[in-house]
Amino acid sequence: MKRKILFVVTLLSTLAFMSCKKDGATPSPSTPEATETTPTTPTEVDTVALKKQIEQEKETLSKPYNEEEDAQAKLDALIAQASKEGKYVFVQAGGNWCIWCLRFNDFVQQTPELKQVVDENFVYYHLNYSKNNKNKAVFDKYTPNSKGLGYPFFFVIDGTGHVTNIISSETLEEGKGYSVAKVKEMFVANAPKK
């Protein structure tokens, strides 16, 4: 019974509020209320604006993923190089379609303390995943349990071709980008022990 009364009171209050007009005035044809527009919610407008902003940002960032590359052949060469240099292969999985992938690449390249840690410890590779080239065999071989991870995600391969770790980028995010401290800590923790 109390629910019915509460519902009726809420309904009547809502109807009364909706029927009120500011100062009792009727909107004139020149006021915004009188013009016919397609109703849009702020969320829809924000989504459209956000998509446009992301596309503009993508245009300014380098595109490190190569859809046409033979990823397994490239990884074989990088593993041999890493073994020779006493480094690991750091693989960033994603694609040029992924704003977070492009942001991470730019973040590492533009942050001297991160770039130094990477250059000293890793051979870096961008493993493409896209509609045109999903590199299914490579992902199945190195990261068979990564299906729940978002892009980018990372994995580290030692000089013998063994995957030492798979890392979600979600733990490294901060706002619209990444945390220098968290990313540096991740690189250091996954570097070869010297």
PLM-predicted stretches and their roles:
Residues K21-D23:
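Bacterial signal peptide processing site
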Residues L149-K194:
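Non-catalytic, surface beta->alpha helical segment in thiol-disulfide oxidoreductase systems
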Residues L102-V117:
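Typically the conserved alpha-helix immediately C-terminal to a functionally engaged Cys/Sec
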Residues A16-S19:
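C-terminal motif of bacterial Sec signal peptides marking the signal peptidase cleavage site
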